[in-house]
Amino acid sequence: CRIMTAALRGQGIRAVALDIGREEAIRLGKKYVHNDICFPAQIVIGEALAALESGKYDDKDVAIVMGKYVGDCRLTHYGALLRKALDDAGYDHIPILTNDDADSHNMHPGFKLNLASSVKIAFALPMIDVLEELLRKIRPYETVKGSADEAFDKALDLVIDGLEKSGVLGA
């Protein structure tokens, strides 16, 4: 989420990473996403709905950005699920932006992620995967509780800061 935000800001788009889903996001996700859909989809969609319901954002001046994966995972369909949830919740006017080149559901007319942003995301996501793998391996051996998470957060901040200031080479 923070990587996409950094890449979009580099493209001149005002972008904000949403808060991690809590009770309200879970409630909204369960309300607007069918129960047969995986819980992560319900949470992600609930986070977007909770942000809109919070009043922090003008729903006439906002778009929701969601990464898209092509494959067997239901993440492939999160954009379409989000579109349905937004429509059902009364936010049918809010566009959804994805990293998908083929806008088969007409969710983000007129928007294209530029090449520089695509490259930033393509290079940064594996960096985050490595950091997360290290975190999972190191956390059980930490001598000070929370120090592994703190180191992960600092490293992630450095990657994102470098990405925003200097592009791929800075990350």
Which residues are covered by each model-predicted region?
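An N-terminal assembly and electron-transfer interface module characteristic of large anaerobic redox
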Residues: 1-171
